[in-house]
Structure formats: C-alpha cells, structure tokens
C-alpha cells in the first residue's frame, strides 16, 4: 500500500497568494497458487489494484485547478489440467476488468469522463504430455555440489539420492508461515536434519552452514522446466471497452469484440544439463473476430474478420551459477486476415471486413553477470522486423496484433513494409559499501 501527501503554499502579510494540496493512495494485492500431482496440474493468479488522487491549486482563495481520479482493476486467471495417464483435459479461464474515472476543473472549464474495460477468455484444451517444474532438482544438485566443493559433504551420492533431496526441498517450500524469518529458520533446520540423517554430511561448522544458507537463498531461481506437451484448443472470448466523455459534445463510445479461436499448441522444455535450458513453443490457429462500435446514437462500424495465425518461439538459457545468466531468443509470427463478404440482405452500411498479411520476427538476448559482491553487469539487446500488407480497398480498418493470445485492436492501420527496430540497454552496478 502506497500513500503520499504534499502541501505547500505561498503567503504574504496580506494573506495567502497560492496554495497547493496533493494526496494520492494506492492498494495492490497479489495472490498465486501452484499445485502439481500425478492427476492434477493447477495454477491460480489473482490481483487487485485500487488507487486515487486529488490535486488542487488555489490563488487568492479561488480554485484555479482541481484534478481528481479513481482507478481500480481486478485480474483472475487459472490454468487447470486433469490427467488420464498421459492424456489430459484442460480449462484455463481468465477475467480482467478495470475502471478509470477523472474529474478535471481548470480555468472555468469542467471535464469529466470514465473508461471501463472487461475481457474474458475460456479456452478448453485436449492434449497429450506434460511439462514439469524442475528447479527443486537443480537446487538439490547446487546444494550437494557446493558442499562437496567445500569438503563438507560425502562424494558419490546417486541420482536417486538427489531426487529424494529435491522432494524434501519441494515439501519445505510448500509449508506455510506468516513470518518469513520463522519460515526460513524452519526450512534450514529441517534441511540440516535431513542431510545428516541421510548421510550427506561429513562435517558441520560455520562453512557448512554458510554454504547451505547461500544455496538455499539463491539456488532456487530462475524457474526450470522439462517435458513435452501437445494440445488442441477451442477458445471463445469477449472484450468490451466503453468510454464516456462529459465535456464538449458529451461523446459516448462502446466497443464490443466477440472472439473465437481453434487450433493446436506444442510446447517443449529441456534442461540440457545443469547449465543449459532450451524452451520451444509452436502455435497455430484459425480465428474469427467481430468488432461492433456504437456511438451515442448510431452503429459506427461492424467488422467481421477471419484470420490464420502461425507462431514459433525458441529460447536458450545459460546459467553457469546461481547469480549469473544469459538468455537468447528468436521468434517468427505470421498472420493472414481474410475478407468475409458483407451479407447482401443486410441494410447496415457499416458492415465490412478486410484482407491483410502480417509478419513479425525478432531475435535478442538478455543477461546478468555477477563479477563480485561489488560489481554487477546487466544488459539486453533485441532486433525486430515487421511487414504488413493490406488490400488497398481496406486501409482504414481495425487490426489485431498477430502475436497476442487475444485480438488486440488499434485503429488507422495502413500498409507498412520492411520496418526494423532495435532495443538496447546496459547497466553497471558498483557498490562502495
């Protein structure tokens, strides 16, 4: 929760000349849940955000400027897969809603408007295979190897021994505590007990405990995955955007999008070894969207747009130790929008659609290098290319981004070819103390 308040004024012996008040407050709540068993994989995510602000400025006791705003948003999503041996049925609903309202008074004018958004998707999957999180197994190997290197653990432990240690780590991480310090103390005590009871430890001293604490604190990230999963999906969705402007012409816009996709999705994740990870995904679907935009008194447009989408993304990660990583990625997304003729029986002049082709491709990397406790390097580089071609008869249209899970619309799309873009960032951190 964040709150801020600022008050300042300028005055003379004759009274206040100016006065400004500013107050803002925000509340953010986030919840996540992960479950993995032989029969059931589940992830839950929920977030709530509420905020507001008030800003006033007065001169000689008269209000010159006042701005007040209120915003809120709720996001809910769930990933569920129920397994029958290697086959599964999945249901992954999501819901997002937001509201923003503002009241602006300045120099004799009064401006009010509000914007609300709501979207939901309810995809259903049927597929084969599963992908598991394996960072606990990697952390078990980190702990054991670090203790062997410090001559505090016995060499020769088998892969089965390390898998049993990984299972213990998973159990400890799922224990719930209100106080994070008590949780960490409990985890280290239980881990120390397990290592001694199962013959891992030769000697326990300050070096042993410092190494164990370090690997427990920093050896659990980033997330690592392993497995293959293929699925066919059916994904209906609905999105509504509404804007009301109470100033001037008192405008009103209501945009509704009805979405439907069906296709296939392939995911592959492979930890090549302790240090290398490869992740590959492929998606192809056919979808149709309908966009109806209403003004206060009339229908402004009614677009019906079928389309085909194909996308491939590959990422390779290199993790030489617990504090350094390098990740390289590349992707290609292709989309084709196909014109659907207007219903000849319709008397609605606003019904239409469009033709177009789109290409998005890019490659890049990001990395974090830990030289020492005092010096760290963080950087990223990306190069991107895009090309869009629209039938000349359909230039001023609503268009969707081909690389999104839903259809993201923006207006005024025109032809664009051979557009290159790049992104580069580099930062060096040096700590004096």
What are the functions of these language-model segments?
Residues 1, 40-48, 87-95, 120-122, ...:
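Transmembrane beta-strands of outer-membrane beta-barrel proteins
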Residues 1-35, 39, 231-252, 399, ...:
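Short glycine/proline- and aromatic-enriched beta-strand/turn motifs that initiate or cap beta-hairpins
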Residues 3-9, 33, 48-58, 70, ...:
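Transmembrane beta-strands of outer-membrane beta-barrel pores
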Residues 17-27, 64-74, 114-124, 256-262, ...:
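Residues that define the transmembrane beta-barrel architecture of outer-membrane proteins
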Residues 28-32, 75-79, 125, 263-269, ...:
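Outer-membrane beta-barrel architecture
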Residues 34-44, 81-89, 130-137, 272-278, ...:
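Repeated loop/turn-to-beta-strand initiation elements of outer-membrane beta-barrel proteins
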Residues 119-137, 416-433:
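Outer-membrane beta-barrel "beta-signal"
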Residues 242-254, 285-433:
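Outer membrane beta-barrel transmembrane domains
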């Amino acid at each position: 929760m964040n709150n801020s308040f600022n008050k300042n004024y300028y005055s003379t012996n004759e009274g206040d000349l100016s006065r400004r008040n500013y107050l803002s407050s925000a509340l953010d709540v986030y919840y996540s849940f992960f479950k993995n068993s032989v029969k059931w994989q589940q992830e839950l995510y929920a977030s709530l955000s509420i905020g507001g602000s008030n800003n006033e400025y007065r001169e000689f006791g008269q209000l010159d400027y006042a701005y007040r705003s209120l915003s809120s948003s709720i996001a809910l999503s769930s990933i569920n897969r129920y397994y029958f041996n290697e086959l599964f049925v999945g249901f992954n609903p999501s819901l997002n809603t937001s509201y923003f309202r503002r009241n602006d008074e300045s120099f004799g004018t009064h401006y009010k408007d509000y914007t609300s958004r709501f979207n939901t998707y309810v995809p259903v999957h049927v597929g084969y295979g599963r992908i598991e999180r394996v960072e606990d197994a990697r952390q078990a190997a980190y702990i054991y190897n670090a203790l062997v290197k410090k001559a505090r653990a016995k060499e020769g432990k088998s892969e089965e021994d390390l898998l049993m240690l990984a299972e213990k780590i998973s159990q400890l991480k799922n224990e719930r505590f209100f106080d994070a310090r008590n949780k960490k103390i409990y985890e280290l005590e239980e881990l120390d007990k397990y290592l001694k009871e199962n013959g891992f430890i030769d000697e326990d001293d300050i070096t042993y405990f410092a190494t164990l604490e370090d690997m427990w604190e920093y050896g659990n990230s980033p997330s690592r995955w392993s497995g293959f999963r293929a699925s066919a999906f059916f994904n209906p969705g609905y999105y509504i955007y509404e804007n009301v402007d109470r100033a001037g012409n008192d405008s009103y816009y209501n945009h509704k999008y009805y979405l439907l996709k069906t296709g296939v999705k392939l995911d592959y994740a492979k930890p090549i070894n302790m240090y290398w990870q490869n992740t590959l995904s492929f998606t192809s679907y056919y979808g149709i969207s309908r966009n109806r935009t209403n003004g206060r008194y009339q229908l402004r447009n009614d677009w019906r747009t079928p389309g085909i989408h194909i996308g491939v993304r590959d990422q390779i990660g290199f993790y030489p130790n617990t504090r350094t990583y390098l990740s390289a990625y590349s992707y290609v997304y292709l989309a084709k929008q196909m014109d659907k003729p207007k219903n000849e029986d319709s008397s609605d002049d606003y019904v239409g659609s469009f033709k177009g082709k789109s290409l998005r491709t890019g490659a890049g990397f990001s990395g974090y290098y830990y030289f020492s406790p005092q010096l760290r390097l963080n950087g990223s580089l990306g190069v991107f290319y895009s090309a869009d071609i629209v039938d000349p008869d359909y230039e001023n249209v609503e268009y969707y981004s081909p690389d999104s899970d839903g259809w993201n619309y923006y207006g005024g799309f025109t032809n664009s070819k051979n557009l290159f873009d790049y992104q580069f960032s580099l930062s060096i951190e040096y700590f004096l103390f």
